Amino acid sequence: MVTLIGMGSGKWEALSAQAQQAVRSAGLVFGAKRLLAGLPADCTARQFALYQPADILETLAQNPGQDAAVLYSGDTGFYSGASGLLTPLRALGIPARVYPGVSSIQLLSAALGRPWQDWKLVSAHGCACDPVAECMMNRSVYFLTGGTETPASLCQKLTDAGMGEAHGVVGENLGTEAETIRYGSAAELAGQSFAPLSVLLVENFDLPQLRAPGFPDESFIRSEVPMTKQEVRAAALAKLAVMPTDTLWDVGAGTGSVSVELALAAPKGRVYAVECEPDACELIRKNRAKFHACNLILIEGRAPDVLADLPAPDAVFI
């Protein structure tokens, strides 16, 4: 029997009685050095500082008939390596079971005294991640960080996109004696250093609530610059059939009303608002900021002269 165990922050005391018994009865125990260091002195199993499935499977093959326990940080079901081992174990017909642990999101939630069921959960640890798009679409976003993506680097990306005022909470070394909670705006946190074991919660309280195509005309900042009216915008977005990752052009963007709606409809894409009139360009900037349309890029110039240098579009509004 191979038992896959979520060890939370790495404390033996945090394991369930079932998980502790599985470790004590195992002949082999696998895990990162940090997790193996949390085992009690009376744990007599042979310990292997291995966590890659191929390495574990090879060692199991060299020790047939022995029960094993494999330790994972956090919870086995939350961006864990457990699934990467469980699949080949089942394919090989090796009996396996899973005991979950306490994830970092639960630890941060408990430290803050707040529920987490409404948070969007995103991994920036070894995964492609667009923090700007996530925070454009969700009021509260929890980032699991690691590797090259730290709380500071994610907050810097938000700041560069114009979301520096978003509220941030960083939890360091959660569930340990060194646990620290830090608060600040994204701009403030971008310039700080954090422990390797850190997570980030970003809350964008100014997230616009308008989502259905065709925002009311009065919701935009206006002047004498012409603006595409609500009914036309709604019909245009329906006809363009915008996808979340699209690259879009709005040529002759005016107040930026169409550009803003395109940007919010394609949060993981880019919208290029082409406009040559200075007054209109200023309105586009203001509406971009009002709606947090961080993926809206203003191109100041006259079409078609400025179009040659833009990425090829998936759809164009003129």
Where are these regions (language model features)?
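Conserved class I S-adenosyl-L-methionine
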Residues: 245-254
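Short SAM/SAH-binding signature in class I
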Residues: 67-69, 140, 312-318
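Conserved alpha-helix/loop element of class I SAM-dependent methyltransferases that forms part
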Residues: 229-244
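Conserved SAM-binding loop of SAM-dependent methyltransferases across substrates and taxa
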Residues: 255-267
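A contiguous loop/helix-start segment that scaffolds small-molecule binding in enzyme catalytic cores
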Residues: 2-6, 50, 65-68, 138-225
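Class I S-adenosyl-L-methionine
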Residues: 1-102, 106, 268-271, 275-278, ...
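Short, glycine-/small-residue-rich phosphate/pyrophosphate-handling segment
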Residues: 104-139, 146, 150
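Conserved hydrophobic residues forming the short capping helix/wall of the S-adenosyl-L-methionine
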Residues: 89, 158, 288
